[in-house]
Structure formats: C-alpha cells, structure tokens
Amino acid sequence: MSFSRETVAKSFLWKLFERFSVQIIQFVVTIVLARLIVPSEYGIISLIAIFIQLCEVIIEGGLNTALVQKKDADNKDFSTIFFFSVGVSFLLYWVMFFAAIPIARFYSQPTLVPVIRILSVNLLFYAINSIQRAYVSKHMLFGKLFYSSFFSVILSGIIGITMAYKGFGVYALVAQAISNQLFTTIIMAFTVRWRPDFVFSGERFKPLFGYGWKIFGTSFIITLFVNARKLVIGKFFQPATLAFYEKGDQIPSLVMSNIFTSIQAILFPVFSEDQDDRPKIKSMMKRSTKMSCLVIYPLLMGLIVVAEPLVSLLLTDKWLPAVPFIRILCISYFFMPITLSNWEAIKAMGYSDITLKLEILKKVIDVLILVVSVFYGVYAIAWGAVLYNFICLFINLWPNKKLLDYSIREQISAAVPSLLISLVMGAAIYWMHILPISRLALLSSQIVLGAIVYISICYLTKEESFMYLLGLLKNNYKRILFKRS
C-alpha cells in the first residue's frame, strides 16, 4: 500500500479538522464545567486520570502501533490484537477496583475510591477503540474518524454540563469521560465497519509483540514521567493546586495535541511505507518540522502574552492562579515540535529499541530534576519541565544524525524562522496590556493584531513553509471552483 501526496494531504486536513473541531467543542464544554465545578474537584479527577492513562498505555501495549507499522497487516493481525487488548482491559479494571483504597489512602482523599471504580469502566471501551483507531490510521480513513469524535464530544458534553448544573460535582466529570469514550466506540463501529474475526493467532502475535513491547516501554515511561509532576504535586500540595497546574498545562496542551496528533497520525504510516527510502524520510521530516513550527510557535507565543485576560474571561478569576503555569509550560512546549517528526521517523524505520533506550536515559534526568525542584515549590516543578525538555531536545535529535545524516544544527535551524517571527509578534502585542480598555477588548485586540503581524511578516519575508501552505490552499480552492463550474 502506497499513499499519494494528495491522499496524505487530505488525510492530514481531515485529521487536523477532526482534532480542532473536537477540541474547540471540548474547550467550550470545559469552560462551562470550570464555571460550575470548583478547582478542588477538578484536582480529584486529575489524580485519577494519571492512573487511568497508565492503564491505557498497558492496554495498547505498543501493539496498535505495531499494526500500523506492519506493511501487510490483515484482519487476522487486527483480530489477534483486539482480543488481547480486551482481555488486558478486563484484568486492569479489577486491578484498579482493588487498588482504589490504597490510592485514596496515599493521597489522603477517601472520596477517590468510588470515583476510581466507576471511571475505570472506561478501560474496556478504550481497548476496543484503540484497535478501531489503528485500523483508521493504517488505511488513512481519517474522514470517518471525524464523525465519531465530533458527535461523541457533543453528546458527552451535554451529559457532563447537565449533571454539573444539577450539582453532581466530580461525578459530572466522570460521566462526561465515560460517555465520551462509549459514544466514540459505538459510532466508529458504524462508520468504519471493521469487525474482528473470532481468532487469536500466536504466530501473528509474536512478531507484533516483538516490535510493540519496545513502543509500550517507551510510551509507559513517557506517560509515567509526564504525570510524575502531577503525582508529586497531588501528594505534597492541595488538590486545588494540582487543578491549577493541570489547567495551566491543559490550555497549551490543547494547541499542541491538536496539531501533534494530526501530524503524528499521518507521518507514522507514511514513514512506515517509505522506511527504506532514507533521503525521502529526511526530506519529509524537514518539511513536517517547518510546518509544525509555523503553526505552533505563534499560538504558544500568543498564549504567553494573553494568558491572564484569557483565563479571567473564560474560566473566571477563581482560575487566575493557573496563569503562571500556562506561561511556564508554553515555554516548555517550544522545544517539542522539532522532535516530533524525528521521533516518528525512528519508530517507522523499525528502531523501537533506540526510542526505549533514549527514553530511559531521559527519564533518569527527569527524576533528578524533579527530586531537586520539589524542595523549591510548585513553580520550581514547572520550571523543571522547561529544563527537562531543553535537555531532551538534543537527546532526541541525536539518532537521526547517524541514521539519516541529518545534523542537529540542521534540524534546529528548521524551526528558527517561525521562532523569530513569533517573537516579533509577541513583542508587538505585549505592550497592549497598558491600554485602559476592558479585558474582552484587550484579548480581542491582541488576537487580531497578533494574527495580522504574524501573517504579514511571513508573507513579506516569503517564509518557505507559509508560501508552501498558501500555494496548497490556492490549488485546492481552484480545484473546488473548477469542479463546481
């Protein structure tokens, strides 16, 4: 199976549209819920989400990635992994059921017990949906993925908001999470129409597991240590403090996850198909890095500048303690676009052992930074994330210096134009906070001026990725007009 440039472009646009539309709706739902539910109850869900995410990584086991990476994967492969994942999800549910009490004791939060036991039901739905998503990614069916994500987030949002309005508190968040995963799984069953055969092949499972366990190890380590700061904050600080940190990470993460997930979903299957054509992979990596930075950097810079009026208007002043975390963690995210396509290329070329070894090295560094920073307070923990991502930038870029003859300097230079233009944009809108205008007027003015400044500079300087994207949009527009005529 080989994907044309047009197929890749359409798939990327579908995936990006799906992520943005879903996240915009989810963001609106979050705003409403944040106004109805106090930060401390959000903190309770944040504590539980850490353990649920770890269980989800175990359920996937890197096997869904292995299905996408395998060139000739058929329904026997998908069915084998499907039944394995479902079996693991049942086992993990009971692990979480009995672990609920010790987890609650660890955090001195007895209210966690029933919430953990109810929310863990999501693991079964996640197991089914993980294989559905692997099938979609393998066959570039991202248009179908849009419908399940779009309608499920609307329906679950209605349920969550209704329950929050009725005073259910933390259980409104639980109901929203479960219904979202349930609706996604059900709708995808109708739109994708993939069905497992009643078969489990040990012969097929062995090579998939041989590749997947390394991806699993990498993903588990990443998930554990991404949440390590939240675990520490949840243990040594109040749930409300964790909620502020979580919200501070959630807002820039909204920007990152939409674009990263879209790019990641497209790059991995494409890289896997061309895994033997190293010059082509290098060229695509360079293009994807530039495109990622073109979109992500101005959004992160904008968030740093407008964080205070944004939080005050959308979430109310009770969430203003999240503003410093938003700004600090936005800086942390600046290093990540450079490594995304790099990481996907290494996995697609079959070097999952390299990703595992490097993750172990990085997490040793992360532990050292976290252990030191925890003694200096919650803001030091956040700045520790910045230091960690800066160090990881060079660790992540090192392998492709040898594998693809792609130097670290060359990889970093791909991000420089977008970074410089974003800094100019940030400086142009920062001064506006001194104007004697309302927060709504300030926020609106900064967004409009920022967009004008960024786009104008990109156009006047003929920034490569901007002109490429502009040309792509023009060609698609002409094609649509031609079809209509």
For each of these PLM feature ranges, what is it?
Residues 3-63, 84-102, 117-120, 152-161, ...:
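Signature of the first transmembrane helix
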Residues 5-9, 66-75, 125-148, 166, ...:
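Membrane-interface junctions at transmembrane-helix termini in multi-pass inner-membrane proteins
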Residues 11-22, 26, 173-180, 184, ...:
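Transmembrane helical elements of multi-pass membrane transporters/channels
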Residues 56-75, 137-138, 248, 252-296, ...:
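Helix-loop junctions and terminal segments of transmembrane helices
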Residues 113-120, 148-193, 207-211, 218, ...:
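Hydrophobic alpha-helical transmembrane segments
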Residues 398-401, 406-408, 415, 427-485:
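Membrane-proximal transmembrane or re-entrant/amphipathic helices at the cytosolic face
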